[in-house]
Amino acid sequence: MSALTTSQLATSATGFGIADRSAPSSLLRHGFQGLKPRSPAGGDATSLSVTTSARATPKQQRSVQRGSRRFPSVVVYATGAGMNVVFVGAEMAPWSKTGGLGDVLGGLPPAMAANGHRVMVISPRYDQYKDAWDTSVVAEIKVADRYERVRFFHCYKRGVDRVFIDHPSFLEKVWGKTGEKIYGPDTGVDYKDNQMRFSLLCQAALEAPRILNLNNNPYFKGTYGEDVVFVCNDWHTGPLASYLKNNYQPNGIYRNAKVAFCIHNISYQGRFAFEDYPELNLSERFRSSFDFIDGYDTPVEGRKINWMKAGILEADRVLTVSPYYAEELISGIARGCELDNIMRLTGITGIVNGMDVSEWDPSKDKYITAKYDATTAIEAKALNKEALQAEAGLPVDRKIPLIAFIGRLEEQKGPDVMAAAIPELMQEDVQIVLLGTGKKKFEKLLKSMEEKYPGKVRAVVKFNAPLAHLIMAGADVLAVPSRFEPCGLIQLQGMRYGTPCACASTGGLVDTVIEGKTGFHMGRLSVDCKVVEPSDVKKVAATLKRAIKVVGTPAYEEMVRNCMNQDLSWKGPAKNWENVLLGLGVAGSAPGIEGDEIAPLAKENVAAP
């Protein structure tokens, strides 16, 4: 599958934006927004409903036992309560991750488990994970005209059953850093057998709840059974609902099971040659769900199959990772990547992501010079700025505003737009720190800015986690000039550390950053990744100049406190996910408790050498 970027689908027409929407009414930090079809008589294609986070009624609430000092908040699960939820995805942090998908499958499941649900996450075994054990359970999976044997590895962490599908197509391809080799040998290059690999994942995931006898949790025993909700994530799991309906339900298996499909990035859809459909071993009934025609010649010209399209059409509920991104997806071809009409048909619900507040905690962060909370942030951030300036080789002066950019160096994140705005910013008394890795052309571009403006710009084009933490703590403003951003994590991390964001007005950035309260909005940027629009450069430069003028004022200090006083954890999003999944009506499902997540005691993932 070759990546389909929004630049390939950009049109000359204006996109879907928030021209005068600096503080949109849909901005509910822990709310969710559902878009459902109206009847034809309704006129508009969609109707919009906004619902705030709901709390369980007293009858629904179950007891939570507060544990010892070592375990400050331990959930006690009630046997038979809640739901059986099975997440399936190609990534699962911290074991495997290239972006937001891995973060969601790493962070959301523990939060749902804390609410009393039995939760499993299924992902490929890309490496020799030392904390995952061989269950000795195997399954025979039919792929094309042959059968492949998969094994199931397992570990139980933070209240969640983590299941890894073991097969040579996953394990033998990934050497070095797992995140760099999940989908192909190099960035932008896919493995030719990705259809086979992820077909294996989908079919093995359907076997796991029935055959894995898991007894790690004292309140949940045995297999998950058949009354489960499968939560599929992105194109790699698109065929799962079809396999469920084709291979299981006609035989009386999983009769009550339901499937939710979550879109993390519409730009990657799993488009393959139409002639490959028989290799999926699905009946003709499902061919139309995969059938897709576009005007591009990758991976082949003309008619194709589209895994994400099938995932959307065959699911019982479609979701995405922020309310505003849901609006963008149905707004037209440019932002819906040719599936906008399908999503207008099915409806789509947006729920904002949370973040790992234990890993990113300025009151305990070992990588920063001065630890702090909302009450001590102003002085502590000044000390951290001085440490950051020294680390970056910039003049140490806490009075100089410091802007930071952290992100993957690819078109979506706008590093080229950021670089183009730097010359205009050099007119100001300002320092800029750039951190990221990715496409070589962008790495060279950022380094050229450092060479052109020594003493004012520093570019680090390598992975450096300690520096990322110090930047969050020491920067005055975090620049997020994304062309599109389904949800975004970087702005959440910045606000967690009291760093207001200057961001593009797209996707989850609209739902999480409030103009004048927690950050600054640049407006909508072009989704055309092939060019840097001069108007976009002006928007980025003007917004950052506006932010620079606020730094050091009482208004800025208030913004810092506003950022830090938010609950950015997964607790609110998990409750919204619970409400949506309960609506699917799987037999035996019940609302969860008001619990707290079990925090990890140590680093979870250690791969073998």
Curated annotation (Swiss-Prot):
Disulfide bonds join 337-529. Residues 46-66 have a biased composition (Polar residues). Gene3D superfamilies: Glycogen Phosphorylase B. Changing residue 224 to S: In strain: cv. Lemont. ADP binds at residues 100, 408, 413, 462, 493. Residues 1-77 form a transit peptide. The keyword Transit peptide applies. Keywords: Allergen, Amyloplast, Chloroplast, Disulfide bond, Glycosyltransferase, Plastid, Starch biosynthesis, Transferase, Transit peptide. Required for the synthesis of amylose in endosperm. This is Granule-bound starch synthase 1, chloroplastic/amyloplastic. The lineage of its organism: Eukaryota, Viridiplantae, Streptophyta, Embryophyta, Tracheophyta.
